[in-house]
C-alpha cells in the first residue's frame, strides 16, 4: 500500500528521504501530490570516509577518505527521473551535501574481498550545503552568475567547474523547468539564453 510507505507525515505534509534512484518515487508522487505537500530530501556525500568491517570478528580496518566529492549539480541526473512532477506546486525538493562515515563488510568476491562487498551502514556526521527547490525559479541557483547571454554547455561546464556531461544534464533540466531556453546552434552545440520572466 503506497500510503503506508512514506518516511515522515506531519501537519506540513509528507517528507520522503531518498538516497538514490528517485525514479522509485514516481508511484508515490503520482498519488501523494494529488492531496498533500511532499518534500523530497536527497542527501549526497560531499566528504566520505570508508571503513571496512571483518564480518566474522567485527573488527574495523583501514579507514580512508574517498577521493570523490559530489556537488549539487550531480543531483540533476536523479532529478531528471522525476521531472514530470517537478512543476507541481505541491512538490518541494531539498538537496543536502553531507559528510559521512560509510561502513562496508569485507565479504566481496575479489581477492581483497572489497569488490562486490555489501554496504553495512552510512552515518551522516555533518552538513556542508542545503539547497531548497520549492519552485521552478529556484533552479536558477544552478546558473553561474557570469553566464548571461548566448552560452553553450561547454561555457556552462567551465563556469560551474563541472564536466560537460553533467553540464548537459543540468541544462536539459533548466530548459525543462523553463529557466533557460535554446536560441540557436553553433556547430553541433546548442546555444542557451536565460529565460526572461515578467
Where do the PLM segments sit?
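Short, small-residue-biased leader/transition segments that mark boundaries at the very start
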Residues: 2-3
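Conserved catalytic cores of phosphodiester-cleaving nucleases, focusing on short active-site segments
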Residues: 6-21, 25, 32, 38-40
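A basic- and aromatic-enriched beta-loop-alpha substructure that forms the phosphate/nucleotide-
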Residues: 28-89
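Long, low-complexity, charged/polar intrinsically disordered regions in eukaryotic proteins
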Residues: 62-134
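Short acidic, hydrophobic short linear motifs in intrinsically disordered regions
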Residues: 147-159
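Short amphipathic alpha-helical interaction segments
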Residues: 162-175
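A short, conserved structural fragment
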Residues: 175-186
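Short, cationic-aromatic polyanion-contact patches
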Residues: 185-198
Amino acid at each position: 500500500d503506497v500510503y503506508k510507505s512514506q518516511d515522515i507525515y506531519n501537519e506540513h505534509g509528507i517528507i520522503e528521504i531518498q538516497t538514490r534512484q528517485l525514479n522509485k518515487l514516481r508511484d508515490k508522487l503520482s498519488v501523494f501530490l494529488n492531496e498533500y505537500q511532499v518534500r523530497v530530501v536527497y542527501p549526497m556525500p560531499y566528504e566520505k570516509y570508508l571503513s571496512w568491517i571483518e564480518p566474522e570478528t567485527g573488527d574495523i580496518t583501514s579507514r580512508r577518505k574517498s577521493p570523490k566529492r559530489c556537488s549539487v549539480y550531480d543531483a540533476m541526473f536523479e532529478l531528471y527521473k522525476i521531472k514530470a512532477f517537478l512543476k507541481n506546486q505541491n512538490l518541494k525538493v531539498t538537496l543536502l551535501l553531507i559528510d559521512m562515515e560509510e561502513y562496508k563488510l569485507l565479504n566481496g568476491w575479489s581477492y581483497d574481498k572489497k569488490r562486490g562487498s555489501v554496504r553495512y551502514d552510512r552515518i551522516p556526521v555533518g552538513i556542508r550545503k542545503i539547497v531548497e527547490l520549492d519552485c521552478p525559479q529556484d533552479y536558477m541557483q544552478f546558473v553561474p552568475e557570469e553566464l548571461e547571454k548566448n552560452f553553450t554547455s561547454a561555457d556552462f561546464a567551465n563556469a560551474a567547474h563541472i564536466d560537460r556531461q553533467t553540464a548537459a544534464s543540468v541544462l536539459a533540466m533548466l530548459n525543462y523547468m523553463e529557466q533557460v531556453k535554446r536560441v540557436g546552434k553553433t556547430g553541433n552545440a546548442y546555444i542557451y539564453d536565460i529565460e526572461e520572466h515578467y
